[in-house]
Amino acid sequence: MKASQFFISTLKEAPADAEIVSHKLMMRAGMIKKLGAGLYTYMPVGLRVIRKVEQIVREEMNAAGAVEVLMPVVQPGELWQETGRWDKMGDELLRFKDRHERDFVMQPTSEEVVTDIARTEIRSYKQLPVNFYQIQTKFRDERRPRFGIMRGREFTMKDAYSFDRDAEGLKVSYQKMYDAYTRIFQRFGLEFRAVAADNGAIGGSGSHEFHVIADTGEDAIIYCPDSDYAANIEAAEAVAPAAPRAAATEALTKTHTPGRAKCEAVAEQLGIPLQRTIKSIVLATEVEGGEPQIWLLLLRGDHELNEVKASKVPGLADFRFATEGEILRAFGTRPGYLGPVGTKLPVKVVADRTAAAMSDFVVGANEEDYHFTGVNWGRDLPEPEVYDLRNVVAGDASPDGKGTLAICRGIEVGHVFMLGTRYSEAMNATFLDENGKTQPMVMGCYGIGITRILGAAIEQNYDARGIIWPASIAPFQVVICPVGYDRSDAVREEADRLHAELVAAGIDVMLDDRGERPGAMFADWELIGVPFRVVVGDRGLKEGKLEFQGRRDEAATAVAPADVLATLKARLAQ
């Protein structure tokens, strides 16, 4: 490839609306061009990276036995109504009507369509297992698109869907996809971690997320440095304190705490650690034909509620936060002074494991400007229902008992789910087993954000000069930068010769024949992030040398023209 036959458009400054590093660098490198909110055109440089990513994904999916299909972006609404996701997905699901007033959606995922394929095409257990995958455009009508392609509305995704005859078969299919994802991210050349996760809106019984490690990542990744334990913040288990609850040593006392509506302020006034306080969080659930049920969740003062965990408490699946009016009726006071002792109306009390292990604690007295001190379970109030309700923090014990937990940041780029029979039962996707009995197919689904990979890779690999692509997904593996290409016959001839040699060897090479000044030429390719550069100049040619430099190298190395290919291959193999 020659630059004169390509399209290169770089910027010295990023647009004002570009917030994060990847967005700024992709815009400056001419990889993407904004069309509208959350909508981007992928320019030639960016598209080359996408094609590299797709190629690796496609190779590994095929190797794992998945079969490629291509499903429509526009899907009939009736399929989504069958599964109930028409109503559950909310405004992110773009719904519209055609000229005949029929409902359609712009797909964010394709569980409904692929399940429809399975129920019409698969009849017998002999046709199972099967795994369909596609690399296709998706659309989510994000309320606030931001961060460039990291949270756009239109994006490209690889989504796969496995169908098995039973749960044991699903475990095999799931492991195949987990292993394939591991190989994919290894081939991308990215530092990543697979973590246990919650299934969220897609549903199912088990899942893992694949995160690219980056300090700028939105997601907290919980892991144990001394073991293989890893989970996202939603799924990471906060184990119960190992020590038994201490005996009560203080009397229950109502204490005046004027204006202290926060645990931190109460602890400061009383001169006690924040860990001696308990925070009260009030939730509500709807009761058909009656008043909402009020719930009081209790956590240690320095801990934060994990809403996903709370939703798993029996009866709290569809909780909402209580209104101020509901709180006033149930407790007789406003938030900041609430507690489980002496409520006006009966409420359901649920304590986090750590809160349930506390003694002599401080909690709201259900009277403005007052808190109780010296509160103890069993003596001052009944023993509560106990669940894991909180986010873990660094230093917590690892659930596998092999050390303590640490936290890093990551960007989610892949997710694998065990769906089970949620969709197959809803859509009557069944098969006949060897006994002639009808059984629901057991499903898994597996997604990778193709375009999101670009942003995540940049967030992990950049410096002050620009992007540093891993060689496997770089737009070009090497760029030849001739100094004086338009002026020196010797430079032009050697650059053309080297270009031809590398092309013949299967190297993805760019020859910059634009005649740019060296500084501008080097700056463009450092910004774009090509992993290796070969400089051809008159001075070096007179000495029988070319300059070879990796994007992360501090200085160039002199290499004989005949040795460039071998040197490049050796570096690419590292």
UniProtKB/Swiss-Prot annotation:
GO terms for cellular component: cytosol. It is found in: Cytoplasm. Gene3D superfamilies: Anticodon-binding domain, Bira Bifunctional Protein, Domain 2, YbaK/aminoacyl-tRNA synthetase-associated domain. It catalyses: tRNA(Pro) + L-proline + ATP = L-prolyl-tRNA(Pro) + AMP + diphosphate. One of its GO terms (biological process) is prolyl-tRNA aminoacylation. It holds the Pfam family tRNA-synt_2b. GO terms for molecular function: aminoacyl-tRNA deacylase activity; ATP binding; proline-tRNA ligase activity. Its EC number is 6.1.1.15. Keywords: Aminoacyl-tRNA synthetase, ATP-binding, Cytoplasm, Ligase, Nucleotide-binding, Protein biosynthesis. Catalyzes the attachment of proline to tRNA(Pro) in a two-step reaction: proline is first activated by ATP to form Pro-AMP and then transferred to the acceptor end of tRNA(Pro). As ProRS can inadvertently accommodate and process non-cognate amino acids such as alanine and cysteine, to avoid such errors it has two additional distinct editing activities against alanine. One activity is designated as 'pretransfer' editing and involves the tRNA(Pro)-independent hydrolysis of activated Ala-AMP. Consists of three domains: the N-terminal catalytic domain, the editing domain and the C-terminal anticodon-binding domain. Homodimer. Belongs to the class-II aminoacyl-tRNA synthetase family. ProS type 1 subfamily. This is Proline--tRNA ligase. It comes from Ralstonia pickettii (strain 12J). The lineage of its organism: Bacteria, Pseudomonadati, Pseudomonadota, Betaproteobacteria, Burkholderiales.
